[in-house]
Amino acid sequence: MLNKDQFADNHFIRTIIEDDLKSGKHEAVQTRFPPEPNGYLHIGHAKSICLNFGLAYIYDGLCNLRFDDTNPEKENDEYVNAIKEDVEWLGFHWAGEPRFASNYFDQLYDYAVGLIKDGKAYVDDLTPEEMREYRGTLTEAGKNSPYRDRSVEENLDLFTRMKNGEFPDGSKTLRLKIDMASGNINMRDPVIYRIRRAHHHNTGDKWCIYPMYDYTHCISDAIEGITHSLCTLEFEAHRPLYDWVLDNIHAPHATRPRQYEFSRLELLYTITSKRKLNQLVVEKHVSGWDDPRMPTISGMRRRGYTPEGLRLFAKRAGISKSENIVDMSVLEGAIREELENSAPRLMAVLNPLKVTLTNFEAGRTQSRRAAFHPNHEEMGEREVPISQTIYIEADDFAENPPKGFKRLIPGGEVRLRHGYVIKCDEVVKDEAGNVVELKCSIDHDTLGKNPEGRKVKGVIHWVSAEHAAEIKVRLYDRLFTIERPDAVRGEDGEYLPFTDFLNPESVKEITAYAEPAAKDLPAESRWQFERIGYFVTDRKDHGKDTPVFNRTVTLKDSWQPK
């Protein structure tokens, strides 16, 4: 359930919107989230989704979901469907049906014809290499193409023939006629159409010319009545082109969109480049786009992150024009905080040590009811059985304890969570000297109460060996060992492969034992394993006969670079 407090507090974009509404410039807010369907959404997109949909929600406006699908070779319906699923999972609903920039191709073509008729666009025959040479540099003005002064009639004829498929791919382009001496390279006669014979996921084989993003995006905003077009700072230099196109096309749109930029999210210890994420998948460093170690929304969902936790993270990351570098601990902290409130509790033992309760009758089972959550009675209770043999965590016992150790030691006492106080009477070892079993006695008068006259400080979790559910647990950690794996240069000044910094211990699969309540859980069921961390039943691999739990986050931030 959304509420207005879940979104970023006052920031410069909210100030702009409030001024626009107060002045009457706009009667209502209309935003859009415009992903290209060429990959899976990641954490940076989650921030943008929360911003665009959140602003529409705060100001009782609308937010469109529009697919900017102008690159047919890279886009497909798999990505379209995944993006829609991710947006809905995050808790947002777009206005009307999803939009596609490709639905506007006819209008875009007509506007291009209008630009040609006005002498503001021309067909160019320069090759890509020649075009780069003519473009100039940041410090040197460009040169006019020798084809820049073609007549309107010739340009109309050539553009029509481009559309009709009379020329080879890449042989001609349509360029805007702006200023080759502009200090902004984006304004040096940018290409707005290219010839490309490629099947399009939405329009099929109707077109063999496709519009460029910078031309398409602003017109799509105008067609949809977008009031505030929000994008990251790398598009700041594209804003003059955005405005130029809208100022020069013959468009009767009532709303004049404006572009505003904010800093993109840079999350440490991961990468968000689609190309590099694809490399991880192709080279099988991960199991797929939804691998729980990936920063994709589908990966984070499979890891056990919640929509509420991601929205909280987006709020804490904030919106500004300054650099937005955020440590992974901020993301994990938001997820941890949300799960602390929402996740029911179970006990599970990851590294079991056998404990025999010598004065508990063999074959007997005793059950005690325990709350699923200490602060939410409505979550109910479960039965926690105890029998003569239990498992505890191996590191909850120390034969030679360090200073301050408050758990089980030879001759010492500890309380079993939701159970008795036990005392370690004997340590059993194998031939190699490894501890393989503890023989303990229980204090029968301590179930649900403290022993009179003595203080037992330690409390440990455990499971009944006879009743425990055997589960598969995947212990996930950060995918990279350094903050910026794609920004390290070698001695020669060249960037080192980001894969050099993959964390070899980013996942470890073990067999563990959990309370019997863990046996029949549905997929994507989130739990706190008491004293260990937060876990989720895997949305793909979990089943009644093969329970699989993924570690979402530990109870505390104890991560150290490897």
Swiss-Prot record:
L-glutamine binds at residues 68, 213. It is an enzyme of class 6 (ligase). One of its GO terms (biological process) is glutaminyl-tRNA aminoacylation. ATP binds at residues 36-38, 42-48, 232, 264-265. InterPro entries: Gln-tRNA-synth, Gln/Glu-tRNA_Ligase, Gln_tRNA_ligase_bac, Glu/Gln-tRNA-synth, Glu/Gln-tRNA-synth_Ib_cat-dom, Glu/Gln-tRNA-synth_Ib_codon-bd, Rbsml_bL25/Gln-tRNA_synth_N, Ribosomal_bL25/Gln-tRNA_synth. Belongs to the class-I aminoacyl-tRNA synthetase family. This is Glutamine--tRNA ligase.
